[in-house]
C-alpha cells in the first residue's frame, strides 16, 4: 500500500474525469472529497450537469484501458451492466466516402464497449464508492477555490443546495468541473494570467433519439455514416446501448438548431449519404423523444504554457481541453490524464515533498496525449470552410496524407490496425510518420493525382 502523501484532496466534478481522478488520488491522501453540484442518481439516469448524456458517448479503447488501470476489471463490470461488446474492426460499420459500401471488416484483436453515458458514470461511480477514503458530496456547489497567503491553494468554499456554506481545507484541488471556471477564477483572484486558448469553431448541432432493437440479422453492431464534406455535413451514428436499444444521432454543422419531431428526424436519417441507418430504424419502435444538443467550439486551455502555476491546483478533462464530441475523445483523454496522475504520484512517493512541482510535471506529461487527440480532429474539422480558427499551414498536405493513409489501410490489415490504434488513442501518432509507412502513403497520394 502506498503511504498517503497529503491529508486531503478535493475533486470538483463527479463526471468521468473527476471520478477517475479521485481513484488516482485515493492511495496518496488520507481523504479524497468529490464535490458535485448535481444530485447524483442512484441508477442509470441523466443529470442536469451533463445535458449531453442523452447523446452517444464513445469510450475509445485507450480510455477503456486507462480505466482498467485505475479500476482493475471494470471492463467486465461494464459488460455485466449491459454494455455492448464491440470487436475492433468487425462490429463497427464505417461508411466513408470513397470506400463504399463500407471500410473493410477485419479482426484487429481488441474489444471495446458501447453504452450510454449514464451507465458508464454509474459503473465508475460504484467502483469509486468502494474506496474507503473517498467521499462524494452531491448537491454541493464550489463557489471559490481558497488561496493561502503565498498564493497557493488552501482549499475550497462551497455551498449546499439548501444554502449551507462551508470551507474545506485541502493540499490539492483538481478542477474536473467540465467548464473549468473555478480554476480560471482562482488564477484571476490571485493576480495570475489566464491560460492561452486555442479554439476551433465547429457549430455542431445534434439530434438524438432511442429505438428498440428490432429482430433481424446484421453484420454490424454500430454504424457511422460520414458525409462527403464540405458539400454535406450530415453525419449519422447508430450505437448499441444497454437494454437492447439503439441510440441514433444525426449531427450537422453550421445549421440553425431546430426541434424536430420523429417524422422530421426520420427524414434527416433518410437523407444521409447511405441508407443503412434509415433501413435499420424505419420500422423500429421509438422509445424516447428527440433530444437536441449544440456544441459551438473545441477549446484547449494551455495550462502547460503558464509560467506561474499555483501549487496545489490541477485542471483535467474538459476543464483543460474540450474536444469536438464527434470524435469521442473526451472521456478517453480524461481517463488517461487520471491514470498518468496516478503514475506521477507513485513515482514521487519517495520524495520529501511529493506535491512540489506536481502541476508542471502533470501538464508536461499530459501534453502529448492532448496534442495528439487535438490534431486528429483538427484537420477533418477544417475541411468545412466555415470552421473558425487558425487553419494549419500544412492543412492541404495533411488532408492528402490522411486520404492516402485511409486507402492504404483499406488494402493492408497491419496499416488498418495501426490507423485505428491511433484513432483509439492506444498508439502514438508518431507511428504514422515511420519512414517506410510514409513512403507507402506518399505512393498512394501520387497514384490519386
Report residues per predicted region.
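Predominantly flavin-linked oxidoreductase catalytic cores and closely associated redox partners
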Residues: 130-268
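N-terminal Rossmann-like FAD-binding beta1-loop-alpha1 element of flavoenzymes
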Residues: 4-35
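Short beta-strand to alpha-helix junction loop
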Residues: 58-59, 107-126, 176, 182, ...
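FAD/FMN-dependent oxidoreductases across multiple families
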Residues: 114, 244, 256-361, 365-369
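Residues in the short beta-alpha loop(s) of Rossmann-like NAD(P)-binding domains
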Residues: 38
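N-terminal FAD cofactor-binding segment of flavoenzymes
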Residues: 24, 44-94
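Helix-loop-beta segment of a Rossmann-like dinucleotide-binding subdomain
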Residues: 97-117, 155, 250-253
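C-terminal helical "tail/cap" subdomain of flavin- and related membrane-associated enzymes
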Residues: 342-449
Amino acid at each position: 500500500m502506498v503511504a498517503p502523501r497529503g491529508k486531503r484532496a478535493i475533486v470538483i466534478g463527479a463526471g468521468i474525469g473527476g471520478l477517475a481522478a479521485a481513484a488516482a488520488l485515493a492511495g496518496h491522501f488520507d481523504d479524497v472529497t468529490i464535490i458535485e453540484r448535481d444530485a447524483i442518481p442512484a441508477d442509470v439516469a441523466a443529470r442536469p450537469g451533463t445535458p449531453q448524456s442523452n447523446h452517444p458517448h464513445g469510450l475509445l479503447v485507450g480510455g477503456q484501458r486507462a480505466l482498467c488501470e485505475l479500476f482493475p476489471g471494470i471492463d467486465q463490470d461494464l459488460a455485466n451492466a449491459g454494455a455492448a461488446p464491440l470487436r475492433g474492426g468487425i462490429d463497427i460499420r464505417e461508411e466513408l466516402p470513397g470506400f463504399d459500401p463500407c471500410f473493410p471488416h477485419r479482426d484487429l484483436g481488441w474489444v471495446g464497449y458501447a453504452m450510454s453515458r449514464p451507465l458508464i458514470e454509474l459503473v465508475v461511480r460504484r467502483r469509486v464508492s468502494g474506496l474507503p477514503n473517498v467521499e462524494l458530496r452531491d448537491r454541493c456547489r464550489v463557489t471559490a477555490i481558497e488561496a493561502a497567503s503565498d498564493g497557493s491553494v488552501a482549499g475550497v468554499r462551497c455551498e449546499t443546495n439548501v444554502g449551507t456554506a462551508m470551507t474545506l481545507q485541502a493540499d490539492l484541488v483538481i478542477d474536473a468541473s467540465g467548464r473549468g471556471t473555478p480554476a480560471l477564477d482562482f488564477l484571476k483572484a490571485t493576480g495570475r494570467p489566464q491560460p492561452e486558448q486555442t479554439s476551433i469553431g465547429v457549430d455542431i448541432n445534434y439530434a438524438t433519439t432511442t429505438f428498440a432493437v428490432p429482430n433481424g440479422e446484421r453484420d454490424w453492431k454500430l454504424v457511422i455514416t460520414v458525409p462527403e464534406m464540405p458539400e454535406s455535413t450530415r453525419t449519422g451514428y447508430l450505437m448499441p446501448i444497454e437494454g437492447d436499444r439503439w441510440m441514433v444521432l444525426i449531427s450537422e454543422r453550421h445549421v440553425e438548431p431546430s426541434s424536430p419531431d420523429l417524422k422530421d428526424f426520420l427524414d434527416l436519417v433518410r437523407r444521409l449519404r447511405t441508407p443503412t441507418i434509415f433501413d435499420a430504424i424505419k420500422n423500429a419502435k421509438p422509445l424516447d423523444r428527440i433530444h437536441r444538443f449544440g456544441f459551438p467550439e473545441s477549446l484547449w486551455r494551455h495550462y502547460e504554457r503558464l509560467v506561474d502555476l499555483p501549487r496545489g491546483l490541477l485542471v483535467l478533462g474538459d476543464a483543460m481541453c474540450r474536444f469536438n464530441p464527434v470524435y469521442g475523445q473526451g472521456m478517453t483523454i480524461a481517463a488517461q490524464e487520471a491514470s498518468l496522475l496516478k503514475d506521477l504520484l507513485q513515482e514521487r512517493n519517495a520524495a520529501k515533498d511529493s506535491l512540489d512541482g506536481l502541476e508542471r510535471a502533470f501538464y508536461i506529461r499530459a501534453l502529448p496525449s492532448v496534442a495528439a487527440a487535438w490534431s486528429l480532429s483538427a484537420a477533418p474539422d477544417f475541411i468545412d470552410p466555415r470552421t473558425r480558427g487558425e487553419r494549419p499551414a500544412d492543412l492541404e498536405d495533411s488532408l492528402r496524407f490522411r486520404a492516402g493513409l485511409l486507402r492504404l489501410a483499406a488494402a493492408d490489415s497491419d496499416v488498418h490496425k495501426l490507423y485505428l490504434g491511433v484513432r483509439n488513442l492506444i498508439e502514438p501518432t508518431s507511428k504514422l510518420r515511420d519512414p517506410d509507412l510514409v513512403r507507402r502513403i506518399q505512393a498512394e497520394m501520387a497514384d490519386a493525382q
